[in-house]
Swiss-Prot record:
It comes from Cryptococcus neoformans var. neoformans serotype D (strain JEC21 / ATCC MYA-565). The gene is YAF9. Component of the SWR1 chromatin-remodeling complex and of the NuA4 histone acetyltransferase complex. It is found in: Cytoplasm; Nucleus. Residues 146-213, 263-330 are annotated as: Disordered. The lineage of its organism: Eukaryota, Fungi, Dikarya, Basidiomycota, Agaricomycotina. Residues 357-392 form a coiled coil. Residues 280-290 have a biased composition (Basic and acidic residues). This is Protein AF-9 homolog. GO terms for biological process: chromatin remodeling; DNA repair; regulation of transcription by RNA polymerase II.
Amino acid sequence: MSSERVRGIQVHRPIIFGSHARLLTEAEKQLAPAGHTHKWTVFLNSAASPPLKQGEPPDYEDIDYLPGGADDLSYFIRKVTFKLHETYATPNRVIDKPPYRVSETGWGEFTVQIRIQLIPESSEKPLGLQHNIKLHHWGAPVEPLPVVSGAPTPTPVPTESNTEVKLEPDTPAPLEESVTPAPTIQRPASEPATNEPGSNQGTPAPPGGDSTEQIKVDVATPALEVIEPSATPAPLSLAARLPIHAWQYDEIVFSDPPRQFLDILNAHPPTPLPAKSRRPRDQREDYEARKKGKSAARGASVTASARASRAGTVDTAAAGTPAPAQIGIPGEPGSADVPLEFTQEMLKGEHNAMLDARVKIVEQMDRWRERLIALEKELAKAKEDVKATAAM
C-alpha cells in the first residue's frame, strides 16, 4: 500500500527562514502609513542559494537580496502561513506557492509565527516555527560610528544698551511668557496693560519696586542668540543604509515516511550546499573588500552598488529616520556578521561548535562530580565529629 510507512528511514530537507529589513525610500514613505520607517520581508527558503549568473550583476548587490531559494519546496510543502502582528490588516497571510515570503512596512519589531502545512502524502502534522523580525543593526558596525556634534550652544551677545542682563530667579514671570513664545511688546509706563488671555492679572508686584510691565520689558530683551541647526540633515551612516539580515538554518526531518511520500522526496533531492561561499561571507567582508579596492570589477563601492539596486535605498533614504547602530559585546557577532549564503563550511563549523560545547559540558560535569565527592567526604567527616562529640 502507498500509505505504508518505510521503517528505519529518516529523510531531511534543509531550510532557512528569517527576515530582511531596510529603511524606506522617500517614494515608499509616501505610500506607507504614517510613522512607518522600514520595509521588511519574512521568508522561508531552501538552504542552498542559486549560483551566480555570468554576465549579470551579483545578486547580493541588490539591497533586497535574500539568501537561499535554489529549490522549489512545493513538492512537499502545501502552504505556509505567516501570522503577523494583530495590528496589520489580515494578520494571517497564507502563501500556497513559492516564494514563501511576506513583505510589509512598519516601525517596530515583533515575533512572526510560521506554520508549515505539508502535502497529504506525507501524513504529517503541520510544523511550527517562529522568528523575531529585526529592524535595527546590532553589534559592531562595518565602519566606525560618525561623530555627532552636540546640541547648539547659546552664544551670549550684548544688548543694545550694552548693559548686563540680570536674571531674577525669585521674580514670578507672567504666565503668558511660559505659554506664548512670542516677544512681549514694550509699552510706555503710562499706557495701561490690556487684558490678554492667560495673563496673570492678580500677581502682586515683586520685591524691589519693579512693576510687572518692567519685568515684561526686561524679559523681552533678547540676551541670548541661539545658533539654529543646519537645515541640511546629517547623512545616514553606512551601517544605517545597509539592510538587516536575520535568518537561521533548520532541517525538516521525516521519520519512517510513507512509501508514496518517500518516492516524492527521492525524486526531488535538495541542491547540494557549496563547499565555500560564492558570495562575500557577510556585510563586513564585502565592505572590507570594497574598501581595499578588491572588487573594482563588480562595482567600486557600497554606495555605487546600492544605487544600482532595484530599491535605491542609499540615494533616497529618508534623512532623520532612526538608524541605531550600537556596539554590542566585544567579540560577539552582530548584524554585519550574518552570512549572505549558507555553505558546507558553515555546517561543519556548527558541527564542530556543538562538539566543543559537548566536551566543555563533560569537563564541567567532571569538575562538579569531583567537588560533590569532596563535599560528601567533608559531610561524612563532620557527621563523625558530631557523633564523637555527642558520645563524650
